[in-house]
Amino acid sequence: MITVGYTLEFIRAYDKLPNALKEEVKGSIQSFRDRKNHQRLKVHKLHGKYEGFFGFSLDRKYRIMFEWISKNEARLHTVGDHSIYD
C-alpha cells in the first residue's frame, strides 16, 4: 500500500474543486494507493519542466500531479484540468 502526502498547493487546488469532483478525487486517491490500479488510472511520467513528476487521470479532463518520495510514498502536488501542466 502506498502512503500519500499532500502539498499546500494540492490542498488549495482541491478546495476550489466542485463538491462532486472532490468525491471523485478521494476515490481516485484511494485507488492510487494500490499499485494494481495504476494502469487504470493511467499513471505516467511527465516531461519537460515537470521532469521527475508523474500524473494520473481522474477522468478525461482532470489530473493529479505527484512525485515519488520513495518506493511506497508519494506526495501529491496539485489537482486540476490540463492547465496544471502549463
Located regions from the model:
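Conserved short hydrophobic interaction patches
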Residues: S28-S31, H82
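Non-catalytic, surface-exposed connector residues within folded enzymatic/regulatory domains
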Residues: V4, N19, E23-K26, N37-R40
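A short, surface-exposed loop/turn module that caps and links secondary-structure elements
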Residues: S31-F56
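Surface-exposed loop/turn and secondary-structure junction residues enriched for glycine/proline
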Residues: A20, H44-K49, F53, K61, ...
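Enriched for short, Lys/Arg-rich terminal
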Residues: V4, L8, R12, K16, ...
